[in-house]
Amino acid sequence: MSITPADLSPASSSDHREKLQELLTAVRDLHDTALQELQAKIAKLKKERCLDAQKLSEFHSKNQHLREQQKIQQEKIRQLEDRLRSGPCDRCTVKEKQIKKTNTELEDNNQRNLSVISELEAERKTLTDENRRLSLELERLRRSGSPQNTSSEAEEGMIPDSPLRPLSLPVASKMKRRKEQNHVRYTETPLSLSHPESRQREQSVAFGCNGKGVLVAETCEMDATSVAERDNKRHFRIVVPETCRPDVYPEQVDDVDDDDLHIPSHTEQNQKPELRDCTNILIAGQNDDSPLILRCRPLASQDHQSSIDDVLRTPANSSTCVLTKGKRKHSNGAKKDREISDCRLDADETDIKGIIFASTPANGRLQSKNQETSEIETTQDSKKKCLDGHTPRKSLVQNHHAPFPYDQSWSVDPGADLGQYDTESSPQPEHQARTDLETLDTDCTFVSHSLLLRGQKTTGQSQTTGIGQKANDSLADIFDKTGYGEYESCPQDDSIDLKQDSVYEEEREEDDPEEKPEAAVVFRRPADRKPLVSDSDKSSRNKSFACVEVVRKKDERRKLKGHYCKECEVYYADLPEEEREKKLTSCSRHRYRYIPPSTPENFWEVGFPSTQTCVERGYIKEDEQPDVRIRRRRPYLAMFSPKAKSQKKKH
């Protein structure tokens, strides 16, 4: 830009000065404003710095104070550690010493108490032993002083020729046994018995009974034989209570009146468990024409001891030793107050029981010439030879090791209750007589119809033995029956209900198909509507079947509590507790609301169309679109049609 001289005129120069002056004033103003702003900022920063300095001083003072407190705490900790290292204080040491002293005193007292207790126990034991010894001595003195218990001394000690050792029982059990057996008396009715034997074997019996009888108590595993010969008319009898295979050697006794003989039997029921099965009363009778016959008879219970007697009935030309139970009195065959009759057992049932029941006439007298002996023998040939032989036995030495001719697997204690025994006993083989003696359960023996009726011959008349003929033999067959003329003390009830099972009936038909029933029996079951009559013909016999009727009606069933399942629990899980229990109780009866019937009406009638035709004609309506779910799901909504399933698959 070129400056012309015209421009350098004084007028133009004045203008330029004014403009420059204005610019300078403007710049000065701007500078002043900026400087003021900066000074204000500096003052503000100075104030903040002062405040920070004050805070810093405060923090420093606090820090110093905390450091001083920390030093004090560390000093205290050091002092406490020094005290712990130095040990407990004096007070603690004194307390510890006192505690140790009391503990030692308590231990010493306990030791002294234990020693005193041991001494007292030893003294008590010695006193009990002395008391037992004195009581045994007192009991022995009482028995030796009483004239009735002369044979009890032998029972307390060891019996000669007996494998059993003497057992020391407590005095309480002995006194209890004597108390229980105190009311039992055994009186023997003497009758003439021929027993020819010399007096040279009289010493074989260790405990003699004044020449009147022998009482052998609790002997086991021995042979029960007795030799009797003719041409010597002397009274001889052997009463053996609670024996199992006893061994009684022949002996010679004096010819003394036996009316005053009294031999009580004190049974020890709780002495050994092995002796509970060996409690038979063996009553031996000997005649002139037949060998010795051992007869077993189960005694009645203690409730009937005063009214039931045990009497032996012997064949012709023989005399019997009768063992009666009751008060001690003089009795003979002509003056008997009690009359006893028994159910006779047929000889055809000999393979069933092996037990001999003896019976007497109705008038109570021993009429041996007008009656025959009814005996039951076992099926074994060896046992039959011991009973069927009509010649007297040669000697005891030959038959010493022979087995007992009867099965001794069960017996009846004369002092025990008869209710725990059964009147039936199945035969046991000879080789099992010893092994089964310990393991056989003799409380109840079951004999089926086939076994009971196998050995019985077909007869035209009804034979009622009273034992083993029916599956449910009544209690009348167990007890004795006293008869006088047409009167019976324990008559048979002809109208008794026979609760026979169909299993017994089928078993009886299979095992014995040719056997005919003895009489037509009419019986009725509680559930039978009509009585069923069993005819004499087996082929036309009607079997009885129990009929069960509906007891509860529909209204009663609705009131019952229902059964619920896991699905119902899940289904009703969102309900409250009370409402859920209410729903679950009716769970088993709500399925009919959701499950449609499987078949329509008249489906099984002839001419009804098929299911597809019923669907096409509209007989069966299918719900293709079910209702909206009331809750989470409806598990019992069932769709049975395959057509609906195929349509759902297509969609």
Curated annotation (Swiss-Prot):
Keywords: Cell cycle, Cell division, Chromosome, Coiled coil, DNA damage, DNA repair, DNA-binding, Endonuclease, Hydrolase, Meiosis, Mitosis, Nuclease, Nucleus, Phosphoprotein, Zinc
Start and end residues of each stretch annotated as Disordered: 138-199, 363-433, 487-539
Matching Pfam families: CtIP_N, SAE2
Cellular compartments annotated: Nucleus; Chromosome
EC numbers: 3.1.-.-
Record GO terms (molecular function): damaged DNA binding; endonuclease activity
Compositional bias of kind Polar residues: 363-379
Post-translational modification (record): Phosphorylation at Thr-599 and Thr-611 promote interaction with nbn and recruitment to double-strand breaks (DSBs).
Major site of localization recorded for this protein: nucleus
BP GO annotations: cell division; DNA double-strand break processing involved in repair via single-strand annealing; meiotic cell cycle
A GO CC term assigned to this protein in UniProt: nucleus
Biased composition (Acidic residues): 503-515
DNA repair recorded as keyword: yes
Zinc as UniProt keyword: yes
The protein's role, per its UniProt record: Endonuclease that cooperates with the MRE11-RAD50-NBN (MRN) complex in DNA-end resection, the first step of double-strand break (DSB) repair through the homologous recombination (HR) pathway. Functions downstream of the MRN complex and ATM, promotes ATR activation and its recruitment to DSBs in the S/G2 phase facilitating the generation of ssDNA.
More details: Binds one Zn(2+) atom per dimer. Zn(2+)-binding is not required for homotetramerization.
Subunit-level organization: Homotetramer; formed by antiparallel association of helical extensions protruding from the N-termini of two parallel coiled-coil dimers. Interacts with the MRN complex; the interaction links DNA sensing to resection. Interacts with samhd1.
Protein name per the record: DNA endonuclease RBBP8
Gene name in the database record: rbbp8
